[in-house]
A protein has these predicted regions:
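Hydrophobic alpha-helical segments, especially transmembrane helices
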Residues: 3-6, 61, 237
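Active-site-adjacent loops and short helices of periplasmic peptidoglycan-processing enzymes
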Residues: 21-183, 193
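Sterically constrained small-residue positions within well-ordered secondary structures
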Residues: 14, 24-26, 235, 328-329
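Sec-dependent N-terminal signal peptides of Gram-positive bacterial secreted proteins and lipoproteins
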Residues: 2-23
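Structural motif marking the loop-to-transmembrane transition
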Residues: 3-4, 55, 101, 363, ...
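Residues in and immediately flanking transmembrane alpha helices
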Residues: 15-18, 73, 195, 274
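Short, flexible loop/turn motifs enriched in small residues
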Residues: 6, 25-31, 225-229
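Domain-terminus/edge residues, biased toward the C-terminal soluble/receptor-binding domains
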Residues: 145, 158-161, 165-375
Length: 375
């Protein structure tokens, strides 16, 4: 009889085991979400990560990075009547006013001002439609494969969409920019106008995780009736950098509780292991542009792999995706990447950065080196 009881207990435990494993994964209200490791871009967990949804104000991450890469932060931006009349100008900007690019962008990101995004688009390209073309070109450049922008602020439009994975790609790219990181990690700020002189406004970041979640470093909220609750968040603990995105959470508050569950899951079940030093991954690349030369390309930092609980570091490998010959100028630029694989499947990548250029070698050595590499 005792043996029979033990047998049935064992059967019961085996039946419960799958549900116990599944229970470890985050249970969220959002229709779609993703968690990636920021350094490599490896997808660690997802729920409909490639599904299209309205990105709402997470769109403003693209508007911000385009401004930071193309406009002097001290340049003054004029507020047009169209910008001032845009739905939800939470900064309270008015037609005829002026703010520096830095102040306007900071205010836009912290309190999600839609009119500020329009003013930025007009300052850069004259109108929002032309600016949207710039946004889509940048999206393609950074690998956002299933995204289309039609405005700079994320107001609902049937043709304005993205996916959790694409938004995570955008956040990963943008968080490499020092000015962007400084903006999105601020809890409070005072925004000053250039004209009228003396006007200012104290603002509080709409990202409620700032100051309330260990290791949080950004990044952007979003909400419309059609988009539901949206949130992109980044956090760092013990050297592990995570980026997560939720789209179409049921309520504005649910997006924060959903995000906590996802980030908690990542920090509990993911760890970084050392792979290769940046010196080990150095790559000599030839430069041809009048005079010939070479550049040394390597990752900016030593390469580490993100592994889930139970994964074996010996299953990790790398491959290069970089040309052997490039045209100048390349100094200080990314010239390829190291592909990180697990069980021979690509799971992430790290950029190869051109650190220095050496000029002056013979055509003979060039031919021998290049053709020797090909052989």
């Amino acid at each position: 009889m005792r043996v029979i009881r033990l047998f049935f207990i064992l059967i019961l435990l085996m039946a419960l085991l799958p549900s116990v494993v599944r229970a470890e994964e985050p249970i969220i209200t959002a229709d779609a979400a993703i968690l990636i490791e920021a350094t490599t871009g490896r997808v660690l967990w997802e729920k409909e990560g490639e599904a299209r949804h309205y990105p709402a104000s997470m769109t403003k991450m693209m508007t911000t990075i385009l401004l930071l890469e193309n406009i002097d932060p001290a340049e003054e931006i004029f507020i047009s009547p169209q910008a001032a009349m845009t739905e939800n100008t939470s900064l309270g900007i008015k037609a005829g006013e002026r703010l520096t690019a830095k102040e306007l962008t900071t205010g836009m990101m912290m309190v999600s001002d839609n009119g500020a995004a329009v003013a930025i688009a007009e300052a850069m390209d004259g109108d929002t439609a032309t600016f949207a073309k710039r946004m889509n070109a940048k999206a393609k450049e950074i690998g956002m494969e299933n995204t289309n922008f039609v405005n700079p602020n994320g107001l609902t439009d049937p043709n304005h969409y993205s996916t959790p994975h694409d938004i995570a790609r955008l956040a990963r790219y943008a968080m490499e920019n020092d000015d962007f990181r400084q903006i999105v990690q601020r809890e409070k700020e005072t925004i000053y106008w250039s004209y009228p002189n003396g006007r200012f406004k104290n603002v509080i970041n709409t990202n409620e995780l700032l100051g309330n979640y260990e290791g949080i470093t950004g990044v952007k909220t979003g909400w419309t009736n059609a988009a539901g609750g949206c949130l992109t968040a980044s956090a760092k603990r013990n050297g592990l950098k995570l980026i997560a995105v939720v789209m179409h959470s049921k309520t504005e508050e649910d997006r924060f509780s959903d995000m906590r569950k996802i980030l908690d899951y990542g920090f509990q079940h993911v760890h970084m292991v050392h792979g290769f030093s940046k010196e080990e991954l150095s790559r000599r690349i030839f430069i041809v542009d009048g005079r010939m030369g070479t550049t040394v390309a390597r990752p900016i930092e030593d390469v580490e792999y993100p592994l889930m609980d139970g994964e074996d570091p010996s299953h990790c490998s790398i491959a290069y995706d970089a040309p052997r010959i490039v045209t100048a100028p390349v100094s200080g630029k990314d010239v390829g990447k190291v592909i990180i694989k697990y069980d021979d499947k690509p799971v992430g990548s790290v950029a190869l950065h051109s650190e220095r250029v050496e000029e002056g070698f013979s055509i003979g050595s060039f031919i021998v080196s290049v053709f020797g590499w090909m052989l």
